[in-house]
Amino acid sequence: MACRKTYRKRTMPAGADVLRSMITQPAVADHVDRLLFGVDSKIQADDLLQNNITEFEWVVRNKIYPNFYGRYLTGENCLTKSEINFLHSKGCKIAAIYRDTEQKQTEEEGHLLAKKVDVLALELGIPDGAAIFLEIDEKETVTRDFMRGFASMLMTEGFTPGFKANTDAKFAFDREFSRGMQSDKDIFKLCLIWAVVPTVKEYNGMTTTHLIHPDNWMPYAPSGLTRKEIAVWQYGRDCHPIEDDAGNVTTFNLNLVRNEQVIIGKMF
């Protein structure tokens, strides 16, 4: 791991501006023909359920084949190399999510967290350029300075910064990200946003297989962005509960992507 990291840093062009220019934002189309379905879960996709199929197969049975699978790099059931191989064998892209409960106030705290993310991403073999979405809980106090530090350092490490957050204007993320778009647009415009609001009532905790996803793309967007620029929208939570082989209740969340280049270029 250390050798690979040293090699990558040595061969990268010097200068933060040059490094930042290597991270690109997927082009946004005014009109799209379809919305692309995917899921995210805190449960491993290859977890065997009580009915002798995997969580991935349970998703397919109850919805449709997912274009991507969002998985956490941290936590009790975090993403493993074995699960990466499993999902890739299914032809499914992976959206990397990082969850951390440490304070998110200063630019230096953002730098330090990005370095932690980089080490873990390298251990898992996540390729350069892939997006890593930092999950921000709606109850967390997060600042523009922290996000600027996190995003700039993660780009320096070769990854695309993203945030999975409540984008409603009533919460801190929306306000602080919007401040960042005003003061440091060159950094913040390269961040991908995974909006977890609004969820659509009939999709939350759903158990029916008849509804797949809403027809219209309606995530909340921070000021400084348009809805079309939101990368991922989580429109339903905690769906299709079922116990796994160990007796633990599993669920998954429902997501849409409007821009296929987010999946092609920023997931792995």
Where on the chain are the PLM-derived regions?
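Aromatic-lined carbohydrate-recognition surfaces of secreted/lumenal glycan-active proteins
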Residues: 157-173
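Short, aromatic/basic amphipathic alpha-helical patches
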Residues: 57-59, 82-86, 149, 175-181
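Functionally critical loop-and-helix segments that line ligand-binding/catalytic clefts
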Residues: 13-51, 56-59, 180-268
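Distinct, well-ordered alpha-helical segments
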Residues: 52, 143-147, 172-183
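Substrate-binding cleft of extracellular glycoside hydrolase catalytic domains
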Residues: 30-52, 63-151, 155-158
